[in-house]
C-alpha cells in the first residue's frame, strides 16, 4: 500500500532556521485526539518514551479534535509533534482544502497504522433503510464527524469521489461521543468513524446495541481509491466488534507522526530511534497496529520524511525513494 508523495505548497515565509536546523526543544507538546481514541493512547506512549528514553527532554500528550486541528496547531507553533491522518497531512503540506492559503510544513517521523473508515448504523435502521452499500446513505440523517476533524475531511473526500451531494443528506457534524448518543436515541441514521480498528468507543457501542457496519461495495472502493492515493482498500475482519461476525469491505488511510520543517535534526533522529527501541509499548497501546509499526511502513508516507528520521530509516536498511527525501 504505497502512497505517492505530496508536493509542497509555496510557503508564505521561509523557515527561519532551515530544514532540521532549529533549536532542541526540551518540553514537547504532542497533539493527539479524544481520550477514548487510539491517537491519545499512542501519543501517551510517545510522551513517556521521550521522557524516559531521550536525555534532557520530556513529552506531554494533549487531547484535541485530532488530525486537522493537530496540523493547524503544528503550523501555528502551538504543538511540536502531531499525529494525523495521511490525507490531512498531504492537504496541509500542499495547502489544499482545509489548508488553502495556510500550508503547513509537516514532515514525517513515522507512519504508524491505518485508520479505517467505519460507516456505522444500528441494525434496525440499516434494515429499514436498506443500507447495503455506502451510497445508500443518500436521504438519511448522517454524521460526517466534528467540524474541522480529520473524520469530517475524509468523509467529505469520500462523498466527493462518489459524487454524493451534501444536499442529498441531512448532514450532522458530531464528534464520536455525540454520534454514539444520537444513534442510540434515534436522532441519527448513521455516521462515520475514521479510526483505528477495534476503537474502544465503537466496541462499547457494539456491546450494548446491535450495530451494522455499512460496507463499501466493490465499485465504490475502486472509485474512491482511484480518486486519491491517500486511500487504500481495507477489510475489517469479522469478530473485530461484538456481534459483527462477517468481514466488512471499506477503505483505510495511514496515520502519521509529523513535525515541522525546522524541528531539530538530531532530536528527530533520537525520538524516532527511541520510538522503535520501545515499539512493544506502542503495540501494547494498540495491538492491531503490530504488523504496521515497523520501519518499512515509512514508505507509505504521503509527505517527505524529516531528515533526522530519514537518517534512522537508512540505518535500518530502508531505502527511501527520492520523493520522500526532504529538500532543503
Model-predicted segments: where are they?
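Pocket-lining segment of extracytoplasmic ligand-binding domains
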Residues: 86-88, 95-98, 108, 123-126, ...
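Short beta-strand->loop
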Residues: 31-36, 120-122, 137-150, 173-174, ...
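A local structural motif
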Residues: 25-27, 51-64, 160-174, 187-190, ...
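An extracytoplasmic/periplasmic, membrane-proximal ligand-sensing/linker region
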Residues: 178, 195-209, 213-215, 223-225, ...
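A conserved helix-loop-strand patch within extracytoplasmic ligand-binding domains
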Residues: 103-148, 160
Amino acid at each position: 500500500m504505497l502512497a505517492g508523495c505530496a508536493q509542497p505548497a509555496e510557503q508564505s515565509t521561509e523557515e527561519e532556521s532551515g530544514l532540521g536546523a532549529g533549536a532542541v526543544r526540551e518540553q514537547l507538546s504532542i497533539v493527539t485526539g479524544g481520550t477514548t481514541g487510539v491517537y491519545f493512547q499512542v501519543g501517551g506512549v510517545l510522551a513517556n518514551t521521550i521522557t524516559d528514553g531521550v536525555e534532557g527532554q520530556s513529552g506531554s500528550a494533549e487531547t484535541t479534535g485530532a488530525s486537522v486541528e493537530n496540523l493547524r496547531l503544528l503550523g501555528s507553533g502551538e504543538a511540536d509533534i502531531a499525529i494525523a491522518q495521511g490525507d490531512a497531512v498531504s492537504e496541509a503540506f500542499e495547502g489544499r482544502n482545509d489548508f488553502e492559503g495556510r500550508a503547513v510544513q509537516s514532515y514525517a517521523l513515522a507512519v504508524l497504522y491505518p485508520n479505517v473508515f467505519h460507516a456505522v448504523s444500528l441494525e434496525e435502521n440499516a434494515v429499514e433503510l436498506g443500507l447495503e452499500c455506502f451510497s445508500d446513505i443518500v436521504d438519511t440523517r448522517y454524521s460526517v464527524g466534528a467540524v474541522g476533524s480529520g473524520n469530517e475531511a475524509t468523509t467529505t473526500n469520500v462523498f466527493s469521489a462518489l459524487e454524493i451531494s451534501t444536499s442529498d443528506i441531512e448532514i450532522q457534524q458530531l464528534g464520536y461521543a455525540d454520534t454514539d448518543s444520537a444513534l442510540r436515541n434515534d436522532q441519527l441514521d448513521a455516521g462515520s468513524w475514521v479510526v483505528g480498528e477495534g476503537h474502544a468507543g465503537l466496541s462499547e457501542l457494539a456491546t450494548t446495541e446491535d450495530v451494522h457496519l455499512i460496507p463499501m461495495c466493490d465499485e465504490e472502493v475502486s472509485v474512491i481509491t482511484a480518486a486519491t492515493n491517500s486511500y487504500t482498500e481495507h477489510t475489517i475482519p469479522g469478530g473485530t466488534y461484538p456481534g459483527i461476525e462477517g468481514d466488512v469491505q471499506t477503505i483505510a488511510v495511514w496515520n502519521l507522526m509529523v513535525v515541522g520543517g525546522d524541528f531539530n535534526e538530531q532530536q528527530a533522529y533520537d525520538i524516532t530511534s527511541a520510538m522503535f527501541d520501545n515499539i512493544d509499548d506502542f503495540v501494547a497501546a494498540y495491538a492491531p497496529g503490530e504488523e504496521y509499526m515497523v520501519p518499512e511502513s515509512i514508505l507509505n508516507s504521503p509527505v517527505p520524511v524529516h531528515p533526522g528520521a530519514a537518517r534512522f530509516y537508512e540505518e535500518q536498511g530502508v531505502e527511501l525513494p527520492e520523493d520522500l527525501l526532504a529538500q532543503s
